[in-house]
Amino acid sequence: MASERVEKILEDLKALSLLEAAELVKGIEEVFGVKAEAPAGGGMMVMPGVMPGAPAAAAPAEPVEEQTEFTVMLEEVPADKKIAILKVAREITGLGLKEAKDLVEAAPKAVKEGVNKDDAATIKKKLEEAGAKASIK
């Protein structure tokens, strides 16, 4: 198997936090003049001085978290479209007339928070069809 020195290095690598592993990768890139990017073609890339089949000290890539909860913002309410937008806001939020009126008049304001992507798009579309300017954050 591997020498004691290699085994110790492997154990040390396993104990690294994600931040430390990212720092290690950056340091290796700077010292050895290599990039830790995956090749575009999906083929195997061999670094100079590294034998194929030798264990590599590569840090795990940080997964990109996809946003799952969105907020629909009411950005602008044209005065001539206020009543139509008010009706849509009441339908979306379930608020009473006074609360919905306060919401519409307070634009820019969050209309609905913590909704999934499809619902957010539907709400935005309804508001825009009524004449409002809306956005998803």
UniProtKB/Swiss-Prot annotation:
GO terms for molecular function: mRNA binding; structural constituent of ribosome. GO terms for cellular component: cytosolic large ribosomal subunit. Gene3D superfamilies: 3.30.1390.10, Single helix bin (1.20.5.710). Belongs to the bacterial ribosomal protein bL12 family. It comes from Gloeobacter violaceus (strain ATCC 29082 / PCC 7421). The lineage of its organism: Bacteria, Bacillati, Cyanobacteriota, Cyanophyceae, Gloeobacterales. Forms part of the ribosomal stalk which helps the ribosome interact with GTP-bound translation factors. Is thus essential for accurate translation. The keyword Ribosomal protein applies. It comes from the Bacteria. Homodimer. Part of the ribosomal stalk of the 50S ribosomal subunit. Forms a multimeric L10(L12)X complex, where L10 forms an elongated spine to which 2 to 4 L12 dimers bind in a sequential fashion. Binds GTP-bound translation factors. This is Large ribosomal subunit protein bL12. It holds the Pfam family Ribosomal_L12_N. GO terms for biological process: translation. The keyword Ribonucleoprotein applies. The gene is rplL. Keywords: Ribonucleoprotein, Ribosomal protein.
